[in-house]
């Protein structure tokens, strides 16, 4: 069950009263940087996995050829 627009406004007001505008802005920017870093690492990971798989195949081929 999703809260309606009135409930969301009440929650927003309570959060602003508890944390204040400046601290809430800092938390938002920190969260944005964390999400940006996560997306960046997710884009780099598949390339790393491909290189690792190529290295494993190359290592197996080298090991078999030395027998």
Curated annotation (Swiss-Prot):
Q: Name one GO cellular component term.
A: TAT protein transport complex
Q: Which residues cross the membrane?
A: 1-21
Q: Which UniProt keywords apply?
A: Cell inner membrane, Cell membrane, Membrane, Protein transport, Translocation, Transmembrane, Transmembrane helix, Transport
| UniProt xrefs under Gene3D superfamilies | 1.20.5.3310
Positions the record marks as coiled coil are: none
**Record InterPro entries:** TatA/B/E, TatA/E
Membrane topology classification? Single-pass membrane protein
Q: In Gene Ontology terms, what is a biological process of this protein?
A: protein transport by the Tat complex
Q: Which GO terms describe its molecular function?
A: protein transmembrane transporter activity
Say what the protein does: Part of the twin-arginine translocation (Tat) system that transports large folded proteins containing a characteristic twin-arginine motif in their signal peptide across membranes. TatA could form the protein-conducting channel of the Tat system.
Stated family: Belongs to the TatA/E family.
The name this protein goes by in its record: Sec-independent protein translocase protein TatA
List the source organism: Ruthia magnifica subsp. Calyptogena magnifica
The upper taxonomy is: Bacteria, Pseudomonadati, Pseudomonadota, Gammaproteobacteria, Candidatus Pseudothioglobaceae
């Amino acid at each position: 069950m999703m809260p309606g627009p009135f409930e969301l406004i009440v929650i927003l007001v309570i959060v602003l009263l508890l944390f204040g505008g400046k601290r809430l802005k800092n938390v938002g920017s920190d969260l944005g940087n964390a999400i940006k870093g996560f997306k960046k690492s997710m884009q780099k990971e598949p390339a790393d996995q491909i290189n690792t798989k190529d290295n494993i195949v190359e290592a197996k081929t080298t090991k078999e050829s030395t027998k």
